Amino acid sequence: MGVYLNPGNDSFRKMVNSDIYVDKTGLIDYTNKVINTMQQYICVSRPRRFGKSMAAGMLAAYYSSACDSSELFSKFEIAHCESFDRYLNKYNVISVNMQEFLSQCTCIDDMIKLLERSVLWELLDVYSDVRYFDNTNLARSMQDIYMQKKCPFIVIIDEWDCIFREYKTDKAAQEKYIDFLRSFLKDKVYIHLAYMTGILPIKKYGTHSALNMFDEFSMIDPGPLAKYVGFTGAVSYTHLRAHETPEHLVC
C-alpha cells in the first residue's frame, strides 16, 4: 500500500466511521459499467463541500488491489449490485490530489515533475523487475508495466482544475498542464478508468478539445450521477430529522 499507488481504504473507512455518512456507493456500479470502454473517462464538477473528495476516496478503496474492502462495502448499496465482486480490489489505482502538489511548488513545471517523481518512486519500487524504456517518464513507465505485466491502471485525480484557479492569466502554464494530462491519459491502453473532480466543467476553461475524451457531469447536467454527487432533498430531509434539526429548518 502506498501514498499515491494503491492508497488502500483507510481514508474511506474514516469517512464511514464518522457521525454522518451518506451512502454513495451506487456510483461504483456506474463506474464498473464503463471500465475499459469509450466512456471510461469521467469528470465530475461541483462546488466545494459536495462530496467530491469522498467519492474519490471511495473509488480508491473499492478498486485498489493493495487492500481487502469486501467487509467495508458489504453493508452499502453497491454490495447488492450484480457488479459488486467484478472489480473489487482488482486494479492498480493511482490517486492524486493536484492541490497537494501545487501547494508545494512555485511553477507548473516543478509541479508536474514532483507529481511524476512521487508516483514513479512507488511504481518503480513495486515493479522493480520491469524493463523500462525511460524510468523518469511516468506515462512510458506505466505503459511498460502494462505491456510486460498486463496490469492496467485506474487513475483518480481530485481537484484537477486547481491549476486554473492559481494560474488564472498564465496561459502557458495552463497549456503545459493540459499537455501533461493529455499525454498521461488520452488513448492509453493502460488506463481502464480515469475519474477527475473539479469545481468547474472542463469546457469552462476553454480546454475541452484537448480533453475531449471525458464525459462531464456538472450541476447543470449531472446525468446518471445526480444522486451520487451531492444530496437529494429526500436524503437531506432524512439526515436533518435524524439529528433533531428544528422542524422549521427541516421544512
Predicted regions and their residues:
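N-terminal pre-Walker A segment at the start of P-loop NTPase domains
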Residues: P7-D29
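Conserved lysine of the Walker
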Residues: K52
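Flexible phosphate/Mg2+-sensing switch loops adjacent to catalytic phosphate-binding sites
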Residues: Y62-N89
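Mid-core helix/loop region of P-loop NTP-binding domains shared across ATPases and GTPases
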Residues: L114-I157, D161, S183-D187
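Structural recognition of the conserved hydrophobic beta-strand(s) that form the central parallel beta-sheet
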Residues: I156, L193-I199
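Substrate-engagement module of ASCE P-loop NTPases
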Residues: E175-H192
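Short regulatory helix/loop adjacent to the ATP-binding pocket of P-loop NTPases
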Residues: K203-F217
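Conserved small/polar residues in nucleotide/adenosyl-binding loops
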Residues: T238-E247
